[in-house]
């Protein structure tokens, strides 16, 4: 669990994410690799809340841009080689689950939008945390406002 998660968990607030949407994006890409260019326009690995989902996405993109076939075997080999999972069996179970639980491949852009929106909210929460911490250290309101504007603008 990262520092941001711990901070908000201590306040009784959970960081927003949709595991279903993350897994639907990955499952759709696994089943129909030609949707990857559409996904790359919207998502990056760091947009995924679950570390392993981001790593799987990175491998899918790497395979696709390298001209490799996107199928169960190539993706399995890639994520095992990348160390995303502790064992090959663990990777097989997870990837099989992704492929079996995709609600609809045709909705992959919608799922990608959900993943991206949750990421943006997490980024806003991180900026809010930074701004709050800075207010305890910086008494000058103009400096605080400028810093806060910059943090929001960067998102």
Positions of the model-derived regions?
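Interdomain "pre-motor" coupling segment immediately N-terminal to P-loop NTPase/helicase cores
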Residues: 97-155
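Noncatalytic partner-interaction/assembly domains of nucleic-acid and motor enzyme complexes
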Residues: 1-119
């Amino acid at each position: 669990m990262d520092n941001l998660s711990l901070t908000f968990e201590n306040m009784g607030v959970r960081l927003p994410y949709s595991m279903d949407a993350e897994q639907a994006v990955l499952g759709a890409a696994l089943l129909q690799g030609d949707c990857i260019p559409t996904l790359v326009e919207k998502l990056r690995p760091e947009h995924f809340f679950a570390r392993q989902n981001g790593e799987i996405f990175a491998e899918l993109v790497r395979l696709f841009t390298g001209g490799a076939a996107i199928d169960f075997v190539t993706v399995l080999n890639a994520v095992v080689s990348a160390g995303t999972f502790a064992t090959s069996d663990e990777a097989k179970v997870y990837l099989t689950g992704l492929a079996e639980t995709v609600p609809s491949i045709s909705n992959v852009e919608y799922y990608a939008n959900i993943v991206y929106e949750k990421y943006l909210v997490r980024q806003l929460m991180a900026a809010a945390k930074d701004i709050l911490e800075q207010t305890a250290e910086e008494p000058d309101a103009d400096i605080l406002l400028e810093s806060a504007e910059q943090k929001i603008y960067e998102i």
